[in-house]
Structure formats: C-alpha cells, structure tokens
C-alpha cells in the first residue's frame, strides 16, 4: 500500500472560543509532517474499529465533495459544520481538524482527522531575582503524537465517495450517540470491521460444529482458515472466500454457513470484503492455553491437530492434560 500526501491544512476548533480559527492556506509539507499524516492515515486504514460507510441520498457532505474542488474552501466548510455542532454540544472534545489530500495506490482520497487535544507537560524558564529558574507547565492543547492514536476521523475514497469512518459516541442532549456519521457527514452507520469478522467466524464455527461433531479445535481451525485467506488477499477476506474454503474442507457446512450469514444482522452487505488487521491475523495464527495455576502455552493453530507435535489427554475426572512433543531444551 502506497500513501502519498499531496497537501494538508489545519483548522483550530477550540469551542472555548466563539468561532473556529480557520487557516487560509495549506501548511508547508516537511518530511516530519508528511510522516505524521502518513502514519495516522495508515493506522486508520488498518484499524478494525473502522466502519465502512456510504453516503445517504441527501448527504450535504457528499454533495460538497462532488461540486467543491477548492481544497481550502472545502476544508473550511467541513471545519465550520463540525465546529458549530461541537460548540452546541460541549461534551464533544475540543480539537484541531486536519484535512489531508492524498492518494492511496494511485486513487484520490480525502483524510479528515479530528486531532483531539491531550494534556501534556513541557519545561519553561523564568527569571527569579536575576537568576533563571526552570520548572514545568501543563499544556492543554497537545495533539496526538506520531506514535499515538487518532480517536476520530474519516477517510473518503473520492472515486466512489465511500468512507472509512472511526467515530465515538458522546453524550448528546442527554443520551450517548454518534455525531460524525449522522450529523456532519450524513452517511450510513455500518458495523465495525471487527464485528463483521466475528460474525463470519461465528457463522463458520457453528456450521462446522453442527455437521462435524467429532472435529476437534473447530474455532482454531476456522480462525486459521480466515487468517490464511486474509494474509493472501491484502488483509481482506470475503464471505464468498470463506464459503469456498468450507466447501473444500468441510463440505457439509457450506449450506448451513449461508443460512447463518443470511440471518446475521451484522453482515448487512455480504458482498463487501472485511478488513482483517495484521495484528488480528497474528493472534488468529496461534492459540493460548492456560492452566489453573497461571501457566500459559501458545501453540501455532496449524499444529493443534498434529499428534506428532501436541496431544490432548482427557482424564476420567474431566480434566485435560497437554503433551508437547519434540521439545528442544
């Protein structure tokens, strides 16, 4: 994946003031600033808390994207809408808004990063009786660090206006609700990627367990199946791919899997692939086994059914012992 930053602009949305401080032009893009935005965009793209959203028919935001090709003016309009809503609902964290024009693998994208303020500390020096005295002072408007996390943001694919959205619920007029998707952007609110992945896994596990009752470690085997597909397909997996794999390895589970997917209220658009983050793929590639006294053993998922490597011994009292073979000390 190649991310190229073309331009970026920053607006100050401090709701302790009556109006936003809107920038009249884009910032000069140094290597440090480019690296900062690249990092946070890549981190958003890899997050499984992201929501895949589509514009509603009357989305003013999408209409603005289609007809306003002035980057600075477009960013100011987005900042204005966001500030007005934040100013009316002060439970929403104050922030700076970075709007970033970038390409991802050659396609045009627009990044909208709400950089919520963090408290931080720095040194300051004052003169006391003619001598310098160093101390620390709290800064209440620190932006997320380069290794930190952007808590709210949207990445818009300008070829079809689809959106990858990271949003949080805040107390709005007495109840917790989203505001970016519903008010600022007027986009659909889809389920996060990790919930979609969980729904696919659960459907596959149920289908296999019902038709292959004697098959051990079904959850681990399904996780490995999905992890392998994601690793081979640019961190994405589709329901159709999972079904094809089930049809090859567990043919009796394919049709029940279809039924579970159809009944799911999480998988609203089964034809769309689900993003699986590299961190989640790594977790799916092994299983942690814990004993009652706190010992933890991590076993690669692909070895769980290999009796040449590990063996699970079932005792009459219902307990299970783990025999690990070919140990090298």
Enumerate the predicted regions with their spans.
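Long, hydrophobic alpha/beta structural blocks
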Residues: 2-280
């Amino acid at each position: 994946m190649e991310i190229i930053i073309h331009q970026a602009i920053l607006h100050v949305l401090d709701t302790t003031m009556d109006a936003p401080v809107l920038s009249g032009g884009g910032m000069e893009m140094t290597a440090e600033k480019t690296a900062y935005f690249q990092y946070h965009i890549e981190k958003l793209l890899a997050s499984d808390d992201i929501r895949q959203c589509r514009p509603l028919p009357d989305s003013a935001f999408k209409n603005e994207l289609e007809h306003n090709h002035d980057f600075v003016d477009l960013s100011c309009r987005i900042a204005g809408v966001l500030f007005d809503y934040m100013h009316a609902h002060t439970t929403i964290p104050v922030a700076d808004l970075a709007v970033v024009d970038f390409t991802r693998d050659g396609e045009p994208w627009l990044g909208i990063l709400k950089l919520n303020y963090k408290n931080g500390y720095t040194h300051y020096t004052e003169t006391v009786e003619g001598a310098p005295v160093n101390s620390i002072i709290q800064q209440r408007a620190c932006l997320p660090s380069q290794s930190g996390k952007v808590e709210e943001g949207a990445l818009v694919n300008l070829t079809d206006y689809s959106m990858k959205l990271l949003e949080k619920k805040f107390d709005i007029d007495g109840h917790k609700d989203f505001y970016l998707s519903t008010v600022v952007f007027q986009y659909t609110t889809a389920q996060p990627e990790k919930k979609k992945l969980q729904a696919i896994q659960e459907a596959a596990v149920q289908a296999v367990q019902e038709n292959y009752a004697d098959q051990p470690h079904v959850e681990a085997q399904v996780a490995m199946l999905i992890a392998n597909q994601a690793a081979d397909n640019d961190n994405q997996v589709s329901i159709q791919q999972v079904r094809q794999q089930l049809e090859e390895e567990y043919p009796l589970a394919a049709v029940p899997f279809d039924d579970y997917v159809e009944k799911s209220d999480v998988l609203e658009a089964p034809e769309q692939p689900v993003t699986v983050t590299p961190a989640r793929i790594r977790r799916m590639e092994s299983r942690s086994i814990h004993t009652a006294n706190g010992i933890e053993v991590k076993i690669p998922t692909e070895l769980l059914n290999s009796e040449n490597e590990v063996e699970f011994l079932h005792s009459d009292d219902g307990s299970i012992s783990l025999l690990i073979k070919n140990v090298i000390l």
